[in-house]
From Swiss-Prot:
Domain of life of the native organism: Archaea
InterPro entries listed in its UniProt record: dCTP_deaminase, dUTPase-like_sf, dUTPase_trimeric
Keyword Chaperone attached: no
EC number annotated for this UniProt entry: 3.5.4.30
Active-site feature positions: E145 (proton donor/acceptor)
Residues reported in the UniProt entry to bind dCTP: R117, S118, S119, F120, G121, R122, D135, T143, L144, E145, Q163, Y177, K184, Q188
Any single Pfam family the record assigns to this protein: DCD
Covalent S-S links between cysteines: none
Task of the protein: Bifunctional enzyme that catalyzes both the deamination of dCTP to dUTP and the hydrolysis of dUTP to dUMP without releasing the toxic dUTP intermediate.
Recorded GO MF terms: dCTP deaminase (dUMP-forming) activity; dCTP deaminase activity; nucleotide binding
Pathway: Pyrimidine metabolism; dUMP biosynthesis; dUMP from dCTP: step 1/1
Name of the molecule in the record: dCTP deaminase, dUMP-forming
Protein source organism: Methanococcus maripaludis (strain C5 / ATCC BAA-1333)
Catalytic reaction(s) noted: dCTP + 2 H2O = dUMP + NH4(+) + diphosphate
Length: 206
């Protein structure tokens, strides 16, 4: 059962669901809009070896970032020109991890799903790849996997990037996400790189 706008207000006001900060203007008919934070991660590895720690740079923007497609040629001169012409803080190409401003806490009988905005899809910008599902009992900010597929796209801090759709489960989970020992991203308050190397099935193969 998907929560309507009335349900979302009820769950937030009764503190069954925490969204911090909460903006009543961001409540849709059956969703809640979330906004882009200022912290990002860019991987440095030539190959993603998922049994090892992934090398990355974590950085913060003041206002805006230009995201270019993977094969878009960038050098120091082009980056400088883009920054001056479009007044952006940062220019990157390829995939990028970001995070929402919103910190969310779900009870054990509510799960959620993140969906990117349709307006972003219309400029071929995707803000999540496969990680749109949020288990019941989750606590933390939502990590975004951002890719531009056509032309460079400029994103701005605090703009709405997607929405959360909340669903009521038939019964509460015995153990919520943040209470499971194997949950790698419980309580995340910033953008986090992949921790897939911690997967138990990988360890068992050693």
């Amino acid at each position: 059962m998907i929560l309507s706008d009335k349900d979302i207000f009820d769950y937030v006001n009764s503190k069954r669901v925490l969204i911090e900060p909460f903006n009543s203007k961001f409540v849709g008919p059956c969703s809640y809009d979330v906004t882009l934070g200022s912290e990002f991660i860019k991987y440095k590895d030539d190959v993603y070896d998922l049994k090892k720690s992934l090398s990355h740079n974590k950085f913060e923007i003041e206002n805006s970032i230009m995201i270019c497609p993977l094969n878009h040629h960038l050098d120091e001169t082009i980056i400088k020109n883009y920054k001056e012409k479009y007044n952006v803080n940062c220019v990157v190409s390829g995939g990028l991890l970001g995070t929402t401003n919103e910190y969310v806490e779900l009870p054990n009988d509510v799960c959620a799903q993140y969906q990117g905005r349709s307006s972003f899809g219309r400029v071929f910008l995707q803000t999540h790849q496969t990680a749109g599902w949020i288990d019941s009992g989750f606590k933390g900010k939502i990590t975004l996997e951002i890719v531009a597929y056509d032309k460079p796209v400029i994103l701005y801090k605090n703009q709405r990037v997607g929405q959360l759709i909340f669903s009521k489960t038939l019964s509460p989970a015995d153990t919520g996400y943040s209470d499971r020992e194997c949950s790698k991203y419980a309580g995340q308050k910033s953008v986090m790189a992949s921790l897939i190397k911690k997967d138990f099935e990988i360890d068992e193969e050693e």
